[in-house]
Amino acid sequence: MELTPEQKKWSSKRRQDVSATCLRSILIEQKGKCALSGVDLLFDVAEGTPKAGGRGCHPLYPAVDHIDPGNPHGGHQIVCYALNDLKGHLPFDCFEALKVTAAWKSLMAKWREQSMKDRADRESF
């Protein structure tokens, strides 16, 4: 997979202590998709830079996720900003249990559906 100019720009600097080289490798491995939902990530910098008093990051903007938080060797993945936020607010064991439920699978199917329908509609995610 060849990275788009937007993906190259996003992955050109270290994030969450992950090197640019590693970020590019993860992006290629994930084919530019969220590791949790399978949705194409939105690499538009304007959508990922919150403005004071304005809207925050777009739910589909990429975020570096520690697969196993607290484990320095737990690895990284790139996920949707909103899903990374959700994961960060739950205990790790709880999130892992949630991922295998029918409700989670249904939610991820709806995310993929909405992403194909109208990814610009932030409130639908």
Question: Model regions: which residues?
Answer:
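Contiguous alpha-helical segments
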Residues: 1-43, 71-75, 86, 92-113, ...
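Histidine-centered nuclease catalytic patch
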Residues: 36-79, 87
